[in-house]
From Swiss-Prot:
ATP binds at S22, P23, S24, G25, A26, G27, K28, T29. CDD domains: GMPK. This is Guanylate kinase. Essential for recycling GMP and indirectly, cGMP. The gene is gmk. It is an enzyme of class 2 (transferase). It comes from Hyphomonas neptunium (strain ATCC 15444). GO terms for molecular function: ATP binding; guanylate kinase activity.
Amino acid sequence: MSNSGHPKDRGNRRGLMLVLSSPSGAGKTTLSRMLLEEFGDVKLSISATTRPPRPNEVHGEDYYFKTPDEFHRMIERREFLEWAHVFDKHYGTPKADTVARLEAGEDVLFDVDWQGADALHDQMPNDVVSVFILPPSIEALQARLMGRPGSTPELVARRMEDAKREIMHWRRYDYVIVNDDLNVAYQRLKRILLVERLKRLRQIDLEDHVRALLGEA
């Protein structure tokens, strides 16, 4: 059931950027989906990309589809919080869209690797809350990857090497969750979100409230 939060609370706080990273197979996508289903005021970040749309993908909902020239102009105008070149295509996070959502009191969820998390933090350090999801063991991670459709020993071996490289950067994150029980991991992620929403720097009306209490309004 969606929980959009108290309308007054949303209006009186600045949203946050919840950045999730993990090695492939650690459960990040499932945890993200659970959070989006429960909290109506948490929105998934929409990336811009130069790859062509797949069937049923909608511009402005799944991605912002751009030509290479359009994408490069956005880079030149510094319109991205972060961008990357992946398999001959470009992907990037438009800054204006994220800022508008934060100012509206919405939280924006990011699914990025450690380099993307670093770039987002460099651009907007006061807004980023970063969480790294770890598997309970290397054996469990390998079993999850082997269980995916289309997996081959070669593909799993490559993903395991990628996973170890990603795990090496766990200390860069504000929070770390070991996903050995999905429901427990989700409750921890949810508590992180709720506590971070209450931080002083996100309560945008507090300064006026304190001035009124002190008779300075």
